[in-house]
Regions:
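Generic structural signal for well-ordered alpha-helices
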Residues: 5, 9, 34-35, 62-70, ...
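Short glycine/threonine-rich loop-to-helix capping motif typified by GTGT followed
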Residues: 59, 92-105, 133-142
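Active-site beta-loop-alpha junctions enriched in small/polar residues
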Residues: 1-2, 21-24, 47-52, 88-90, ...
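Conserved alpha/beta-domain cores
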Residues: 34-38, 56-89, 99
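Structural preference for beta-strand elements that scaffold enzyme active sites
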Residues: 15-18, 41-45, 82-86, 121-123, ...
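Active-site loops and adjacent core secondary-structure elements that bind or stabilize anionic groups
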Residues: 111, 117, 121-124, 128-194
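Active-site beta->alpha loop and helix N-cap motifs at the rims of alpha/beta catalytic domains
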Residues: 1-54, 58-66
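Conserved, mostly hydrophobic/aromatic
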Residues: 8, 85, 151
Length: 194
């Protein structure tokens, strides 16, 4: 809720991050909110979402992040180091083929942001990744760890994650690690079945 975000910004000492704004209500509303956040000393977390919906492919994620970055700098008065992008960590392993690339597309978007939107930071909500495996905490924990391992290598700066839902990457059982790597990196279409 926007009013709650504003109240938090007005009444919190120290640095605040507003999670989140997006282009889904159009450019003018996006800029209005961004300027208000900046005026109150906050940084923005920008979701890869616009009037056409949530970005689910690599090209759409790049397009929306580039557009938001340009608007925040040119019209919002932001310096790049006050912009954080969340390019949407979406659920993989659902059995729906369109979802197979969601994790690797997120990682590639993070890498692209680091190369093309200088100074911007990246973030994401990790638990979304493994919703298809609710009730199987061992698999979910391995998925989160493997995903973070690769996303951090790609340039991920921060993540929203439940630390009790993580395993050490180096301690994941080899067969589980192989299966999870195949799901996250979309390197084997049969990985979810294994």
């Amino acid at each position: 809720d926007w009013e709650t975000n504003l109240a938090g910004l007005k009444n919190t000492r120290g640095k605040c991050y507003v999670n989140s704004i997006s282009l889904k209500e159009g450019e003018e509303e996006f800029i209005r909110k961004a300027i208000e956040i900046r005026r109150l000393g906050g940084d923005v977390i920008v979701m890869a979402f616009d009037q056409e919906g949530q970005a689910t492919t690599l090209p759409r994620r790049k397009e929306i992040c580039q557009r938001a970055y340009n608007l925040l700098i040119s019209r919002g008065g932001y310096s790049p180091d006050h912009i954080i992008f969340d390019p949407n960590i979406l659920t993989v392993g659902t059995g729906i083929s369109e979802h197979d690339t969601y994790a690797i597309d997120f990682i590639e978007t993070v890498r692209w942001i680091k190369e093309n939107l200088p100074g911007a930071k990246t973030s994401g909500g990790v638990s979304n990744l493994s919703f298809a495996f609710r009730g199987n905490n061992k698999v979910r924990e391995a998925m989160h760890s493997v995903f973070l391992y690769h996303a951090i290598q790609g340039g991920l700066d921060m993540a929203i994650v439940n630390p009790s839902m993580l395993q050490l990457y180096s301690q994941i059982e080899p067969e589980l690690l192989r299966c999870v790597e195949d799901v996250i990196l979309n390197s084997d279409p049969q990985a979810t079945e294994r």
